[in-house]
Amino acid sequence: MANLFQELYHKDLKRIYKTFKTSGGSVILDNVIGDIPDLQSYFENIKREINPDTKILIAYHNSAWEPFLTLATKLGLRKKVGVQNWLDQEDLRNILILSGFEVISSQRRFFGITVITVAKPQIANYKLQTGSESQYSVSIMIPARNEEQNVSKIIPSIPRFGKWQEIIFVEGNSTDRTWSAITNLKFLISKQTSNFNEQKFKRVVKAYQQTGKGKADAVRLGFAKATGDILMIYDADRTVPASDLPKFYNALASGIGEFANGSRLVYPMEGQAMQTLNKLGNQFFSEVFTRIFGQHFKDTLCGTKALWRSDFLKMKRDYLKYLRVDPFGDFALIFSAVKHNLKVIEIPVRYKEREYGSTNIKRFYHGLLLAKLAYIAFKEFKL
């Protein structure tokens, strides 16, 4: 009985494979993507090993079957498996695009357990061919409030990417020693600057204290002080791994997107990284904003984002206008990016539990605020 669903899966798989023929060779990935911790890196590695005319056929479980397959496992009708990636077709399409593939088709039966996606390598775009993906400077804004024990761990965890990096801490209204931790870190990094220069990589740390309140005000100040070609936001709570930041950089440098928005709702989360009610609310409002904006948003509340500084300067007036009703600043950026027709690309990231401190989100208050922002967006973009 434990193999019942596996038998159904393979029967469905055989029926669908009959409809596909490929020339130039193919690579078949049969139900493996559920176990891969970083699918973007996985597909990038595959791309490096195959010929340009090779097609990849990806077979995986339809995400609509997740609750049924989970129940089947509990009832002993399906073999036990570890925590799985449950991707819908848009999730996989987005990851393939980020990895340098072009999606040819995606098929599933109405009641089918199996989804088949066919993709091929994209022709390398001009920016990547000329090696310019490492020629842009980066300013990383890090708003920090009550993050004393996280601050010292941030910079060592940020990979070296880009022409040079400018890391901008903005602290405000902390009740612990966050500001002291930032200034101590800045001093230590300044002593190491000569070593970075010897290795032909420049990393500068700046620190400011905001006079206003809230994350949105902190990011606004950081953007005003930034000088890099690409602007990034990275939350000091470290719930998103800093090792994912190069993915945001590469998405812009390669021309795949113009506004890179993190998404924590693709991969499984760690423990109680996001409470169930918060997750459901995020999913609901993401669907609402997707319909309003006409561009796909899986996670509107992820704090990790990236955009070109030149684009930010063009949309700055709208950004400051929307900032008046958005204490976090995420929607002010999203509204402005959509209004200025920037191409949004989502970057799937892992979401971890906090190691220190507590969230600044007030569930019901900010839920009402999201409803207000959705109403403002509807009036702005639909009426």
Q: What kind of region is each of these model predictions?
A:
Residues 65-75, 204, 210-225, 242-323, ...:
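Acceptor/aglycone-binding surface of glycosyltransferases and processive sugar-polymer synthases
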Residues 231:
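Short aromatic/hydrophobic "clamp" motif used to bind/position activated sugar donors
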Residues 179-225:
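Conserved donor nucleotide-binding strand/loop of the catalytic core
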Residues 40-55:
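A short glycine-rich, Lys/Arg-flanked "PGG" loop and its adjoining helix->strand segment in the class I
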Residues 74-91:
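Acceptor-substrate binding/catalytic loop of class I
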Residues 35, 177, 234-251:
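Acidic donor-binding/catalytic loop of UDP-sugar-dependent glycosyltransferases
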Residues 171-180:
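A conserved acidic beta->alpha catalytic loop
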Residues 6, 10, 56, 112-118, ...:
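Hydrophobic helical membrane-anchoring modules
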